[in-house]
Regions:
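Structured binding elements
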Residues: 135
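Active-site-proximal beta-alpha core segment in soluble small-molecule metabolic enzymes
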Residues: 1-132
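A conserved active-site cap/scaffold subdomain adjacent to cofactor or substrate pockets
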Residues: 139-146
C-alpha cells in the first residue's frame, strides 16, 4: 500500500487516526506531516490462512492473510510500536482484516481474541499504551444465484 504523502497530510489535518500498513511508513509519515501523531494504529497480518470452515455459500472471498500485501508481522508491529513511541506516539491501536465474506458468527470473536491477546503481549513487551482495537470489515452478504 503506497499511501501518498498528501493523503497522510489530509488525514492529519482532519484529526483522523492513521493506521500504518508497513514498518517503512513510520519514517514516511513523519516526513510527510512533520511529526508522529499522539494516537496511531498499525495493521497486523498474522500470515497463513484464517478460516473458520466453509461459509454457507462454500467460500470466503479473501481468507489468506499470508498472501496479502498489507499489514505487519508480529515482529514488525512490535518494532513499529517501539519506533513510534520513541518518536512521540502515546496511544496505539491494532487493526487487522483477515477475511472477507465472513458469514460465520465465529469470525469476530476469533479475531478479537487474537488481537486482544496481541495487544496484551505488545503492551507488556514494548510499554506502549494500546487504547483501541479495530476489527475491520469483512462481513459477508448472502450471494445467491439469479
Amino acid at each position: 500500500n503506497e499511501t501518498p504523502a498528501e493523503d497522510y497530510r489530509l488525514a492529519a489535518k482532519l484529526g483522523a487516526v492513521i493506521n500504518l500498513d508497513d514498518l517503512t511508513h513510520v519514517d514516511f509519515l513523519e516526513r510527510a506531516i512533520g511529526y508522529i501523531p499522539k494516537k496511531i494504529g498499525c495493521r497486523f497480518n498474522p500470515g497463513g490462512t484464517f478460516s473458520l470452515g466453509e461459509t454457507r455459500e462454500g467460500f470466503q472471498v479473501m481468507d489468506k492473510p499470508g498472501d496479502a500485501k498489507y499489514g505487519m508481522t508480529r515482529a514488525q508491529i512490535a518494532e513499529a510500536f517501539r519506533l513510534l513511541k520513541a518518536k512521540g506516539a502515546e496511544e496505539f491501536g491494532i487493526h487487522a482484516f483477515l477475511a472477507s465474506n465472513t458469514l460465520s458468527n465465529e469470525y469476530y470473536p476469533a479475531l478479537a481474541r487474537m488481537l486482544f491477546r496481541l495487544a496484551a503481549e505488545l503492551q507488556q513487551e514494548t510499554g506502549c499504551y494500546i487504547t483501541f482495537i479495530d476489527l475491520s470489515g469483512g462481513v459477508g452478504i448472502p450471494y445467491r444465484p439469479g
